[in-house]
């Protein structure tokens, strides 16, 4: 159905492509940013086609209206010796009123029908055998990612397998919120989906090529809305299997960092965070079992490095204003011990 609608829109979309290219940026350049014009997933391709169709129609309207405006300004500009007699008026002209009523109605009707067809094509999919089920929960200001069938809990990184002809593997996302309204959006994979307290929404993606894609919260949710980022990592089928196996393993119990482990369990850390295989089972903050396997800290606001981790433990709000994690007022020795322990959680 999506394919049929795209054929209807193809000629107008071509004009939209020309306008977009003229506006600046190559396809290669756009692919490096979270853009709906660089899709890598089946639903995102449909969204781009619809966007190009709408851009094409509105581009034609702009050219016609702007062209007429320029023509009128030039053709009827004031000249020396102009006849100042009032020209014939067209107020009440039935033909003109019909034209400026019927033409916009036809344009809106076409946009409505094509959009409805795309929406049905994108949202009409239901989970099927072989699909991956993931639950995404928005928090202020981070993302909790759960894989119910795999027993995996992580944060701020969505890992999914690529879908190919040999092994089609769509991913179906259950989107929820633990506090206020958020909106889950990875432009290159799918459209926005609101995360609303006490409500469950569904979204599906079907990535067609491996890679790393950037997303963000698209609904204002407080002081760190702009810092509520996430990353989608699309693996090959075999790489995803290895990633899942590593995430299912319990946390390492390294004897060299026993002081940091004891400190983690004795402070409020274990009341807010979970580390699988330990007494730490808090649910208010991200699961830290494999913290160091993630690329960023603070929901994408900084790279995950030993130095940044130590700075975060020392004073989270200095790095992410409004972060709900309090400063623990640790001594330098305690900071070193706690950092050393967390660095083993891979």
Residue map of PLM features:
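Non-transmembrane, membrane-proximal soluble domains of secreted or membrane proteins
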Residues: 28-53, 73-283, 298-321, 326-339
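Short, solvent-exposed mixed-charge patches
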Residues: 2, 345-346
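Hydrophobic alpha-helical membrane-insertion segments
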Residues: 13-22, 62, 105-109, 113
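Alpha-helical transmembrane segments
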Residues: 51-78
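N-terminal secretory/membrane targeting signals
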Residues: 1-31
């Amino acid at each position: 159905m999506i394919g049929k609608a795209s054929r209807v829109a193809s000629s107008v979309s071509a004009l939209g492509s020309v306008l977009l290219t003229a506006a600046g940026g190559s396809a290669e350049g756009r692919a490096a940013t979270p853009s709906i014009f660089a899709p890598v997933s089946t639903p995102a391709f449909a969204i781009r086609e619809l966007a190009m169709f709408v851009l094409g129609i509105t581009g034609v309207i702009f050219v016609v209206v702007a062209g007429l405006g320029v023509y009128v300004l030039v053709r009827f500009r004031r000249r020396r010796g102009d006849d100042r007699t009032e020209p014939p008026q067209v107020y009440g002209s039935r033909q003109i009123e019909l034209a400026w009523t019927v033409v916009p109605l036809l344009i809106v009707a076409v946009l409505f029908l094509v959009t409805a067809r795309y929406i049905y094509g994108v949202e009409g999919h239901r989970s099927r055998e072989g699909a991956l089920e993931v639950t995404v929960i928005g928090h202020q200001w981070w993302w909790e990612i759960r894989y119910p069938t795999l027993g995996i809990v992580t944060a701020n990184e969505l890992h999914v397998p690529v879908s190919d002809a040999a092994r089609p593997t769509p991913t179906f996302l259950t989107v929820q919120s633990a506090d206020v309204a958020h909106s889950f959006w990875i432009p290159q994979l799918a459209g926005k989906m609101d995360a609303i307290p006490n409500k469950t929404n569904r979204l599906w993606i079907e990535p067609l090529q491996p890679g790393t894609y950037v997303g963000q919260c698209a609904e204002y949710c407080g002081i760190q809305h702009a810092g509520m980022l996430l990353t989608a990592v699309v693996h090959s089928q075999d790489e995803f299997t290895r990633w899942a196996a590593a995430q299912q393993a319990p946390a390492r119990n390294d004897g060299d960092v026993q002081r940091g482990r004891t400190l983690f369990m004795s402070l409020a850390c274990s009341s807010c965070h979970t580390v699988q295989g330990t007494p730490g089972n808090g649910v208010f903050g991200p699961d830290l079992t494999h913290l160091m396997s993630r690329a960023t800290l603070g929901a994408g606001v900084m790279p995950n490095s030993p130095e940044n981790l130590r700075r975060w433990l020392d004073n989270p709000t200095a790095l992410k204003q409004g972060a709900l994690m309090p400063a623990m007022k640790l001594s330098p020795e305690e900071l070193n011990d706690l950092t050393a322990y967390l660095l083993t959680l891979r």
